[in-house]
């Protein structure tokens, strides 16, 4: 997976990382090419040892509770769409590789499984869910940003041709599962024809938790500076660094 430069996304991202008073919003939109090279090919070969690329993997139902296989069916229909809530292992690899590239080097998603992903029922539902979360958090600032945001995404990925997936991990695996996390979402807009994924990730962190962490980090840095003054330079490299987690 290769991160593709996009100046429109950079402009939008600068407005998705803000402090709202009682919370911090941290969001980003990134575009990735699905063309594999080097390490990706090696990882894909290892991934395929558990199943061939065309094998279908069952996904979890979307958090809406509405399965894509049910859209367009009458309420009395009992049959279940065999493909709607599944994806090929190759597509699953693309989703996992996107997470790895986006969160590198802090997290490794190589062990992620299909049940941690969902296929979303429709573009409209995803757009409304994103808009609702960000309007509640950012108010009028997002109202003015919204058309530019979705125009930039559509221009990059052609939304009408996309399958949309989300990552909804267990708490133990969630990179946003730390204390103080108020909400988060992780959406993948996958255009198979373009061999490209746009990844939209956002979270809201309690202002108290975020400030407390920053204050702790500053204190750690002050302590390290004092240690630098007190200790011989030859021993400085052996000291463990303090981190705010």
Swiss-Prot record:
InterPro entries: Maf1 (IPR015257), Maf1_sf (IPR038564). GO terms for biological process: negative regulation of transcription by RNA polymerase III. The keyword Thylakoid does not apply. Keywords: Cytoplasm, Nucleus, Repressor, Transcription, Transcription regulation. Pfam families: Maf1. Gene3D superfamilies: Repressor of RNA polymerase III transcription Maf1 (3.40.1000.50). It comes from the Eukaryota. Residues 59-84, 223-245 are annotated as: Disordered. Belongs to the MAF1 family. PANTHER family: REPRESSOR OF RNA POLYMERASE III TRANSCRIPTION MAF1, REPRESSOR OF RNA POLYMERASE III TRANSCRIPTION MAF1 HOMOLOG. Element of the TORC1 signaling pathway that acts as a mediator of diverse signals and that represses RNA polymerase III transcription. Inhibits the de novo assembly of TFIIIB onto DNA. This is Repressor of RNA polymerase III transcription MAF1 homolog. It comes from Xenopus laevis (African clawed frog). The lineage of its organism: Eukaryota, Metazoa, Chordata, Craniata, Vertebrata.
